[in-house]
UniProtKB/Swiss-Prot annotation:
Gene field: prmA
Gene Ontology biological process terms in this record: methylation
Main location, first listed in the record: cytoplasm
Database matches in SUPFAM superfamilies: S-adenosyl-L-methionine-dependent methyltransferases (SSF53335)
One MF annotation (Gene Ontology) recorded for this entry: protein methyltransferase activity
Stated role: Methylates ribosomal protein L11.
Binding site for S-adenosyl-L-methionine: 153, 174, 196, 263
Source organism per UniProt: Chloroflexus aurantiacus (strain ATCC 29366 / DSM 635 / J-10-fl)
HAMAP family: Methyltr_PrmA
Protein's recorded name: Ribosomal protein L11 methyltransferase
Subcellular location: Cytoplasm
One Pfam assignment: PrmA
E.C. no: 2.1.1.-
Length: 328
């Protein structure tokens, strides 16, 4: 039996460059996987951590050492060279890993993480003794986006803790690892629909839903709303040859959801604003995140144009999360 070797590509970046460099590595890395190695400050009690936003972040991706590996490595280096012209990056580091080393290399970077008052994210390979009232999310990210480590995910989890009400119909759009959908279910939602245009993310989300035993509450499917159907995997930045027509909303459910969590990026939120408004029930709430501060005004304007009312704004570093309500 032939054993596959892997090429690890790693680069140290400032926190503000994490999103840009992650998109590049996801575009070329195996299964779109990117490991985010952040600095953590240990809590006073138990395995609880806080992210240190003042220190650089290591990003890693992996390539199978096949005939295309060298060409792909050069493409990554070329793309990162362009980023380096506008943001500081550390030198690119590479190393070769055997199959068994690669399979576990990324797991060391995920600690048990408390987010908000009740939510605790526990990697599936670690043990954790829950405290009273803890909402435990067992997560194997499989190198898919949505581990709870990124500020945008943490902002959403904080809001879900407070906004999810018993029996609600919830949509998690761009579910990634399924973390927000699982959290909504465990916080009391009646039914949750988790959508993603990336088939790898859909598979990982399915596995995590079953791992958390919420498959009776959470439906995972490949897809998006209306105009998002034509986009492909939005996290890669590849929207296809043309921008989808924002007037195409035939696939958007009408007034279906009490709560929508859309942890995407600003330009996708702007494009999907009409679909998001249509999918909300009157009085329903939209949590939008993945918004870098310089793009916030565009999102606010797009949501206002479709009649959504902003009721909350939350910030972590350069990232913004908003809460909007559809009028009654």
């Amino acid at each position: 039996m032939q054993t596959t070797s892997w090429l690890e590509i790693a680069v140290e970046v400032d926190p503000e460059a994490v999103e840009t460099v992650s998109e590049i590595l996801a575009r070329y890395g195996y299964n779109g996987g990117v490991v985010v190695e952040q600095s953590w400050i240990a809590g006073d009690e138990g395995p609880e951590f806080q992210y240190d936003p003042n220190r650089p972040v290591w990003l890693r991706t992996y390539l199978p050492l096949d005939a295309q590996a060298e060409e792909t490595r050069q493409q990554i280096e070329h793309a990162l060279w362009h980023v380096h012209q506008i943001r500081p990056l550390g030198p690119i580091q590479t190393r070769t890993l055997a199959e068994e080393d690669w399979a576990n290399a990324w797991k060391q970077f995920y600690p048990v993480l408390r987010v908000g008052e009740r939510t605790v994210i526990v990697p599936s390979w670690l043990e954790y003794q829950p405290q009273p009232n803890d909402v435990v999310l067992l997560l194997d990210p499989g190198m898919a986006f949505g581990t709870g480590l990124h500020p945008t995910t943490r902002l959403c989890l904080h809001l879900l803790e407070r906004l999810v009400q018993p029996g609600q119909q919830v949509l998690d759009l761009g579910t990634g690892s399924g973390i927000l959908a699982i959290a909504a279910a465990k916080l009391g939602a009646g039914q949750v629909l988790a959508l993603d245009n990336d088939p790898i993310a859909v598979r990982v989300a399915h596995e995590n839903v079953e791992r958390n035993q919420v498959q009776d509450l959470v439906t995972v499917a490949e897809g998006s709303l209306g105009a998002g159907q034509a986009m492909g995997h939005w996290l890669s930045g590849d929207f296809g040859p043309e921008t989808p027509d924002p007037t195409l909303h035939d696939n958007t459910p009408q007034a279906t959801f009490d709560l929508i969590a859309a942890n995407l990026i600003a330009k996708v939120l702007v494009l999907l604003a009409p679909d998001l408004a249509t999918a909300l029930k009157p009085g329903g709430l939209l949590i939008s995140s993945g918004i870098i501060d310089v793009k916030e005004a565009e999102v606010v304007a797009a949501f206002a144009a479709v009649g959504l009312q902003q009721i909350e704004r939350h910030v972590e570093g350069e990232w913004v999360a908003l809460v909007h309500r559809r009028p009654q």
